[in-house]
């Protein structure tokens, strides 16, 4: 019996003394005991370490160490008594006990593993189902937002938005530029129209003055004469028709013709002016200015004092001549050198005794020359001509076309011609 591998097997308890499964064995007065509806206690491996087993004995790792939840089981006292009834006799019940014990342990191990797997699977299934119910929407939305297709669509949307914004900005800038151009064009046209209106109003005023000055006075006086004629009763016999014809001839002789100023451009002068307008210059050798110098400027600035006249012309060309009234400086403070160049009653250009109300200064010189109203008008007419062509050269005349510029130049030449012929305007 000492070498028997199953020696001492009857001393091993398959359950803990406190296990509900063997309460019927510990308490003989209890006929039937039920376990907890959901907990079954299994023996711990430490309870089996007292009896060593051989190779064909039970393995400690096969025994469960944790409680396994299962459906409630009911054990009869008869089953417990059967297990314990055979235990005292080891000689007769060792083979049957080993076989039955191995069978029960194997089946119990399989059931425990199945129950554990089932419970773990159920727990995992319930947890995953709960998580899916709670976080399902957020997980799906995050996965969709992070997907490459959504990112690609977002990038394309951003690029499309940037393109649309840039296009809208370009269109806005284009509209602003067009509006500015239209505004500038409208302002230019308005200024030109105002200039034309001023010219037309001046022409209308001149025509009215001309018509009123040239209209005969007899038609206006005839109604007055007829009104003053006393009324006579009866009638007078017209002795002959010759008297009626004679009266009509007298009326025709009294009526004066109505005339108006007409103008027509000389083609040669107009072509020369257009050529000069394309490339404006102040050089007197160009055909346009050379003709004006010969016909208007030189005759207008020709005086008895030739040296002073040449100096005046040079100052006019250089735009350094100044004219000022005599009243700005009292006569008693006039220097002797200025008196030698004329005086309040002697013109320095003609040498004639004339009342001089103005004086000229050439450049920065302190010497003043007294001039008569006639000489002053001739000098100012030339200065006006040079001032206008300088404006054209500098591009300051923008409200007039070529025709208007040409007639303005002709008007200035007309003033120079009248001045050299002796016509001038004096300030009262």
Curated annotation (Swiss-Prot):
One of its GO terms (molecular function) is guanyl-nucleotide exchange factor activity. It is found in: Cytoplasm; Nucleus; Cytoplasm, Cytoskeleton; Cell projection, Lamellipodium. The modification Phosphoserine is found at residues 147, 149, 215, 218, 240, 248. It comes from the Eukaryota. Transmembrane segments: none annotated. InterPro entries: RAB3IL/RAB3IP/Sec2. One of its GO terms (biological process) is protein transport. One of its GO terms (cellular component) is vesicle. Guanine nucleotide exchange factor (GEF) which may activate RAB8A and RAB8B. Promotes the exchange of GDP to GTP, converting inactive GDP-bound Rab proteins into their active GTP-bound form. Mediates the release of GDP from RAB8A and RAB8B but not from RAB3A or RAB5. Modulates actin organization and promotes polarized transport of RAB8A-specific vesicles to the cell surface. Together with RAB11A, RAB8A, the exocyst complex, PARD3, PRKCI, ANXA2, CDC42 and DNMBP promotes transcytosis of PODXL to the apical membrane initiation sites (AMIS), apical surface formation and lumenogenesis. This is Rab-3A-interacting protein.
